[in-house]
């Protein structure tokens, strides 16, 4: 990483190439109270005589230390430093990576107090990183000035993220220089995964405590904001443009005039949620890393029932591998002859009639242009079938899906599929309850049956929409906070939908 070394005086800047400019240096200041100057000690003429040693050595018993807790956070060393001279003459050296030295430790102390989970934080250099996220599941980069990585470090971080690790970027005092540079680095590390605003109903805001707004030094109720990079449904990297570390350690950056940071209660609330998300989603991250997401697109075979997933302008591949796992479920449990892997098709270019079953998955907003929409409508009118699924059951995709369906069928209404519909009454499975996770039950209280919506073409359902995530259940790994069906129900409900399609 580029090193910006700064030394000396009241606040002196080294002139080495690549050093940060003065406008950035104002965000690298000591955080907290000034250290107390050492008292001057004068030697007097008298002193105490040496104390006598005991005649017999005191017995000492070996103290047994319990094993160290599992590591959760690795705070990464990067950048350079500034020397700041306080009015009392004391000089504080402030490092880019360590403006709040106890931030991670204090966060984990709060995590233990709230959840009972005990973890430790370690300090590491990227050169020390083994690359195995099981050893250090979270990397924390904090700072006030611009951060940059070498090509080798970017490659190492890319592998770490794809293997299931999570990266946090904390702007400490709300430095725009740090946040913007972190965003730029993530675009270089994972160019295929654009940075997105994390939606307000995302699990990371609702795990330990449901968070909407928190107190900052500038606002009593600032809406929580995170920028994130998603790998599949998993939030792999987050950037907090409002500082977190000051609040974790109950410190105030009073020397930074333009500081913007969460007060302790809000910072700890969000930090604990982030930590629980990293812990709870680790198995899902490892599933993605294991290669389930890398299945090759299937090819149509006249002896098999081909299934295709639609490519849109949005985050269409929001749950890689889920479709393939579902097809294997169909083959094992319902003896449906499939290719074993899903084809990925673009409405504009594909011959849709080759694929009698289409699947549309998503996270966030999306749209289809009018020609593609008209082509898809002709396909459905000719007997095709479309299943739309809401990854993690979030509100943004729900709104986008309903707008899309309204444009696709302007003359029809999307309606609830009742329990006495033939899809359920003649299906291979019966449902005694909703099959929701706790989060889905909280989102849709009072539901006692699976929640599906549909659009009919005469007596036949041509389109089915699930606002509660089906595909997450097909993956059969924990996804805390997701509005989804239980794994035991998701496969059976998907099988019921496919059985209806095959028989109608």
Please name every model-derived segment.
Residues 101-108, 154, 158, 179-183, ...:
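Extracytoplasmic/secreted envelope proteins and their assembly/folding machinery
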């Amino acid at each position: 990483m580029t090193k910006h070394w700064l030394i000396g005086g009241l606040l002196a800047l080294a002139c080495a190439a690549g050093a940060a400019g003065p406008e950035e240096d104002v965000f690298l200041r000591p955080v907290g109270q000034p250290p107390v100057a050492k008292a001057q000690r004068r030697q007097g003429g008298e002193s105490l005589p040496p104390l006598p040693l005991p005649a017999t050595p005191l017995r000492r018993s070996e103290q047994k230390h319990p094993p160290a807790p599992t590591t959760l956070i690795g705070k990464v060393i990067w950048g350079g430093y500034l020397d700041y001279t306080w009015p009392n003459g004391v000089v504080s050296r402030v490092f880019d990576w360590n403006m709040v030295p106890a931030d991670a430790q204090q966060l984990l102390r709060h995590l233990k107090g709230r959840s009972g989970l005990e973890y430790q934080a370690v300090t590491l250099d990227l050169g020390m990183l083994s690359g195995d996220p099981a050893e250090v599941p979270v990397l924390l980069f904090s700072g006030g000035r611009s951060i940059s990585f070498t090509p080798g470090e970017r490659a190492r971080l890319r592998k770490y993220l794809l293997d299931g690790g999570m990266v946090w970027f904390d702007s400490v005092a709300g430095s725009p220089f740090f946040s913007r540079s972190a965003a730029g680095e993530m675009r270089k590390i994972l160019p295929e995964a654009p940075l997105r605003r994390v939606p307000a109903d995302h699990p990371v805001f609702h795990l330990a405590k449901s968070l909407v707004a928190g107190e900052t030094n500038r606002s009593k109720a600032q809406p929580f904001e995170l920028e994130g990079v998603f790998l599949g449904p998993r939030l792999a990297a987050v950037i907090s443009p409002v500082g977190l570390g000051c609040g974790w350690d109950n410190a105030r950056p009073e020397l930074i005039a333009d500081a913007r940071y969460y007060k302790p209660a809000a910072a700890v609330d969000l930090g604990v949620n982030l930590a629980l998300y990293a812990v709870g989603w680790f198995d899902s991250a490892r599933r993605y890393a294991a290669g389930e997401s890398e299945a090759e697109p299937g090819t149509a075979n006249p002896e098999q029932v081909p299934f295709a997933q639609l490519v849109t302008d949005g985050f269409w591949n929001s749950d890689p591998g889920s479709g393939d796992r579902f097809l294997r479920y169909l083959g094992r449990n319902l003896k449906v002859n499939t290719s074993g892997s899903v084809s990925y098709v673009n409405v504009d270019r594909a011959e849709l009639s080759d694929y009698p079953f289409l699947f549309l998955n998503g996270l966030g907003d999306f749209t289809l242009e009018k020609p593609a929409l008209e082509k898809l409508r002709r396909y459905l009118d000719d007997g095709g079938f479309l299943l739309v699924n809401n990854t993690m059951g979030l509100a943004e995709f729900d709104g986008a899906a309903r707008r899309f369906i309204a444009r696709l069928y302007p003359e029809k209404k999307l309606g609830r599929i009742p329990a006495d519909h033939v899809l359920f009454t003649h299906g291979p499975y019966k449902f005694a309850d909703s099959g929701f996770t706790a989060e889905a039950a909280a989102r849709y209280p009072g539901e006692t049956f699976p929640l599906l919506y549909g659009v009919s073409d005469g007596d036949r359902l041509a389109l089915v929409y699930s606002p509660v995530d089906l595909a997450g259940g097909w993956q059969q790994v924990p996804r805390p906070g997701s509005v989804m069906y239980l794994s035991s129900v998701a496969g059976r409900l998907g099988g019921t939908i496919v059985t209806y399609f095959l028989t109608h």
